Structures are given as structure tokens and as C-alpha cells.
């Protein structure tokens, strides 16, 4: 029985062994085992409801399916290449256990709509789990921001010191990225949440089935509208892969920042030993391997998205075997992003912030130059003129090896007579930060508002 092809009636010879090996997806789609069982249970209930099979037959099939699932979880189901795919494995196991009645499970169904159902069930569950991981990470970031709310650091553009900002403001930028990721996943969920079952091979079925009953049983909001589209559609997987690529990209940017900030050249942060490794030859090394892996794995997540896009690029309607390739892309990306989210959350929870080095780093690089230009504007100087004047002042400071704070009032007045004693208070780093009260800015007041808004956002999702 185990070597039987359930579709072999039309064929006069067995498939080649090398083709069996090439064709089989069982070692990949075995991850869909439980979803396939749940889909079959709902399908059989519908067949009985519509008087396509008897109630006693449905009960026997359903009881056996649940027992097969239990045995699978206990490791009692043996499978291999000859089983071809997860659908055939389960159906053969069912027939082996209950005989002729088991052969009725596939009535009014094709593997084409069956696998689409399994994948939608899988994506829904994984989507919800990813949402929870992101919520957890946003909470961790919010806590880190609150604990270091008034720590000042340089903000960077072009990897050069630009303007002083609060560390809390900086780290909350990643919370905003993750917020968008969360909203994107929620949209993905709604796009996935339509039941494909009942579309059969491509044209629907001649049996008088109730697709809406199956959808309700499995918690879908609706049913798909066109059977040809349904069995060939993998948009919901593409959208999931795009969302995963975006998430991983955001994590990669954070990883890159922290890799830089963790160096001796910056010393803004210190990574916990538990997320670093050493060198096989250099005894002094403490390498940020966890962050580097998050950064490195971004490439494979991108590749999964591009891979499936390429598979779908030239497919004619409707179903084609090419679609079997979608699962490796999907499973790989989900596992990679899940692990990355978990790891980076733990890194943030164990992170040490070097407040002194951060604020000391603000003393060089003329990061208060923009504020000096703003000061001149308050004295009636047009901004473009103020920009030019401050550019000359910075050039003078570089040549004189001075900071803006080092200049005397007399030196300032060489460049602009409107500069007064109050300039020194205006260009203090703390003043530079806390004057930026525009909505979404880096002032303490603004950052507190950002934290409150994030908490409110997360609470509304509960």
C-alpha cells in the first residue's frame, strides 16, 4: 500500500525512481500535516452535511483523521519519498486504517485547492505568531527608551555626526518600523483569510457542496470568488514573503547600527557575552556574531521573495507543478525571521548603554551647527544667509582646532554682529535637543508622547 500512487489508474507503467525523487515534496510539505488534517475534517463534515457521504462514514473518517494526527505528533507515522506529498501520505494512511470508506475523503476536492487551503491555514497561524513577536519587540524597545529617556547621543547622516538626539528617540525609530511591519502583517492576514476549498482542480465541482460551511468551520471570513484564480493564486504567500523581507531588512539595519556602536571606535553600547562569540586565533576578540547573522540572513529572505516571484513570472493559468516550489521559500523565510525577532529581542533586553561615551561624542563634529544657524534666524538673518555664515564659522573652527563652544563672543562677531551672549545657551547640546519640540522630534516632551502613542497602539490591538 505504501508504494501505491493514488492517481495511477491512467498509467501503464510505474514512475521512474529518479522522477519519484525529483517529484516528491513530502520532506518539505510534511510541515503542513496538521493543517491538512484540519482541512480534511472540515471537508468531510461538509460532505456529510450535504448528503454526499453518510454521517456514520463521516464520523469514521474524522475519528481516524484525528487518530492519525495524534500518531503523527507521537512520531508513529513513517513517511518517505514514495509517499510523494503530505496529502497522499494522509489519504493512504486513512485508507490503510479504515478501508473503502477512506477513499471517499477526496470527494469534491483536488490537491490543487487542498494545498491552497493548507498554505492559507499555515500562513494565518504563522502571521499571528509573528505579530506577537513584533509586539514583544516593540514593548522591549519602548522599555529601553523609557529606561534611557534622557540620554543624549549624536544623530548621524551619511554615517557622519549630524545633530544631537536622544538615544530614546533613536531607538524608537525602530519601533515605528516594526509598527508598520505589524500593520502590514495584519493586512496580509485579511488577504489570506478566504477559503479556497471547493475550487477543486480549477473549474469547481459538480457536487452540491457548501463552501461557506467549510469556511466557517475553519474560521475564514469569506470564500474565494474564482476557482481558476484560486488554485493558481500565491499572492498571499508573496505578500507574506514581502512582509518578512521588510521585517528582516529593518532588523538588519538595527543590527548594523549596533555592530558599529559596539566597536571600540564608538563604545556607545556593549553587547552581552551571551550573544557574542570569540576568535579561534585572537584571544582578545568578542565578536557580534548574533547581529552579523541577522544581517547576513537578510539576503536569504530577499532571495526567497525573488525566488517565488520568478517561479510565478511566466506561469499560465491555472495550476502548474511549479507552484510546489513555494513552500521552501515560505518555510525558510518564516523560520529565519521568527528566529531573528526572538534573538534581537533578547539582545536588546541584555544591552548595556554607555551614556557617558554617547554624550561625550556630541562634543565633536559641530553637531550643534544647525542650531547656531537657527539662532541667527531668530535674530533676523534669512536662513540661507545664516547657513553660509555658520559654514564659515565651522571652517574657522576647524582651522583653529576649536569647537563652537570654544569661540569667544568677539570671534563670533567677526562673522555676524547680531550674535549676542545668549548664543552659548542656545547651542548647548541639551538645549539643542529639547528645543526640537515639533511633533515627532527629539525633545524629551516629544519622545514621551511617542512612547505614550506606541503603548496606546499596542493596547488597541489586544
Curated annotation (Swiss-Prot):
Pathway: Amino-acid biosynthesis; L-arginine biosynthesis; L-arginine from L-ornithine and carbamoyl phosphate: step 3/3. GO terms for molecular function: argininosuccinate lyase activity. Keywords: Amino-acid biosynthesis, Arginine biosynthesis, Cytoplasm, Lyase. The keyword Amino-acid biosynthesis applies. Its main location: cytoplasm. It comes from the Bacteria. It is an enzyme of class 4 (lyase). GO terms for biological process: arginine biosynthetic process via ornithine; L-arginine biosynthetic process. GO terms for cellular component: cytosol. Its EC number is 4.3.2.1. It is found in: Cytoplasm. It catalyses: 2-(N(omega)-L-arginino)succinate = fumarate + L-arginine. CDD domains: Argininosuccinate_lyase. Transmembrane segments: none annotated. Belongs to the lyase 1 family. Argininosuccinate lyase subfamily. HAMAP family: Arg_succ_lyase. This is Argininosuccinate lyase. It comes from Caldicellulosiruptor bescii (strain ATCC BAA-1888 / DSM 6725 / KCTC 15123 / Z-1320) (Anaerocellum thermophilum). The gene is argH.
Amino acid at each position: 500500500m505504501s508504494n501505491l500512487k493514488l492517481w495511477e489508474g491512467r498509467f501503464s507503467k510505474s514512475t521512474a525512481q529518479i522522477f519519484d525523487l525529483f517529484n516528491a515534496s513530502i520532506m518539505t510539505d510534511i510541515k503542513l500535516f496538521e493543517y491538512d488534517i484540519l482541512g480534511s475534517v472540515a471537508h468531510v463534515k461538509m460532505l456529510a452535511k450535504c448528503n454526499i457521504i453518510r454521517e456514520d462514514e463521516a464520523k469514521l473518517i474524522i475519528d481516524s483523521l484525528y487518530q492519525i494526527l495524534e500518531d503523527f505528533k507521537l512520531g508513529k507515522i513513517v513517511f518517505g519519498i514514495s509517499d510523494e506529498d503530505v496529502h497522499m501520505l494522509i489519504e493512504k494512511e486513512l485508507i490503510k486504517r479504515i478501508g473503502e470508506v477512506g477513499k471517499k475523503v477526496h470527494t469534491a476536492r483536488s490537491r490543487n485547492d487542498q494545498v491552497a487551503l493548507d498554505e492559507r491555514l499555515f500562513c494565518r497561524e504563522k502571521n499571528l505568531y509573528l505579530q506577537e513577536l513584533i509586539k514583544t519587540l516593540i514593548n522591549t524597545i519602548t522599555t529601553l527608551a523609557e529606561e534611557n529617556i534622557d540620554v543624549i547621543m549624536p544623530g548621524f547622516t551619511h554615517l557622519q555626526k549630524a545633530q544631537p538626539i536622544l538615544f530614546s528617540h533613536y531607538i524608537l525609530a525602530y519601533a515605528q518600523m516594526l509598527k508598520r511591519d505589524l500593520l502590514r502583517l495584519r493586512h496580509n492576514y485579511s488577504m489570506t483569510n478566504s477559503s479556497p476549498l471547493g475550487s477543486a482542480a480549477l473549474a469547481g465541482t459538480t457536487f452540491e457542496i457548501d463552501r461557506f460551511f467549510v469556511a466557517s468551520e475553519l474560521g475564514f471570513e469569506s470564500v474565494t470568488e474564482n476557482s481558476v484564480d484560486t488554485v493558481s493564486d500565491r499572492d498571499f504567500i508573496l505578500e507574506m514573503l514581502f512582509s518578512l523581507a521588510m521585517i528582516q531588512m529593518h532588523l538588519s539595519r538595527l543590527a548594523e547600527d549596533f555592530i558599529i556602536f559596539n566597536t571600540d571606535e564608538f563604545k556607545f553600547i556593549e553587547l552581552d557575552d551571551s550573544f557574542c562569540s570569540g576568535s579561534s586565533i585572537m584571544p582578545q576578540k568578542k565578536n557580534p556574531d548574533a547581529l552579523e547573522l541577522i544581517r547576513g540572513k537578510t539576503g536569504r529572505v530577499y532571495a526567497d521573495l525573488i525566488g517565488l516571484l520568478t517561479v510565478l513570472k511566466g506561469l499560465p493559468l491555472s495550476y502548474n507543478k511549479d507552484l510546489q516550489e513555494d513552500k521552501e521559500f515560505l518555510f525558510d523565510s518564516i523560520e529565519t525571521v521568527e528566529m531573528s525577532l526572538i534573538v534581537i529581542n533578547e539582545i536588546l533586553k541584555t544591552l548595556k548603554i554607555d551614556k557617558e561615551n554617547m554624550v561625550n561624542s556630541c562634543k565633536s563634529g559641530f553637531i550643534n551647527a544647525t542650531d547656531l544657524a537657527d539662532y541667527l534666524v531668530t535674530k533676523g538673518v534669512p536662513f540661507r544667509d545664516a547657513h553660509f555664515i555658520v559654514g564659515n564659522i565651522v571652517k574657522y573652527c576647524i582651522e583653529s582646532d576649536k569647537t563652537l563652544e570654544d569661540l569667544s563672543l568677539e570671534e563670533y562677531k567677526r562673522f555676524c554682529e547680531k550674535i549676542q551672549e545668549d548664543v552659548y545657551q542656545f547651542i548647548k547640546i541639551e538645549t539643542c535637543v529639547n528645543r526640537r519640540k515639533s511633533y515627532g522630534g527629539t525633545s524629551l516632551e516629544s519622545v514621551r508622547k511617542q512612547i505614550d502613542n506606541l503603548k496606546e497602539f499596542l493596547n488597541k490591538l489586544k
